Design a protein with these regions (language model features):
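Substrate-binding clefts and catalytic carboxylate motifs of secreted carbohydrate-active enzymes
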Residues: 1-109
């Protein structure tokens, strides 16, 4: 089984309140993962979070913009993956989606 988690896209963290909604995004992500782990357990299938992400602070796309909230969100997700791996649950791993990557964003937003 695989899941995606996009707190901004799903309305858990509006672009003008990313830092303020970080805890809500974490809590909703945990609930979403746990719900899908229950389904994975029912069918005895591993669960992979194949795609997730969190925007840069202030919804900026510049490579030099701050990523404090995103770093905190990623740490939370990676800690969940590590905790589940240590407990030998069906949560098999994750990938993350890199916003900005090698592309050069337009300064026109």
């Amino acid at each position: 089984m695989n899941i995606h988690i996009w707190p901004y896209n799903w309305g858990w963290a509006p672009k003008d309140r990313l830092q303020e909604n970080l805890e809500k995004a974490k809590q909703n992500s945990k609930v979403y993962i746990d719900e899908h782990l229950a389904v994975a357990k029912k069918y005895q299938k591993p669960l992979v979070m194949e795609e997730f992400g969190y925007p840069r602070d202030n919804f900026q796309f510049s490579k030099s913009s701050s990523v404090k909230a995103r770093d905190a969100y990623y740490k939370y997700i990676f800690d969940l993956v590590l905790d589940n791996a240590s407990s030998h649950t069906l949560f098999a791993g994750c990938n993350f989606w890199g916003w900005g990557g090698f592309a050069n964003p337009s300064e026109r937003i």
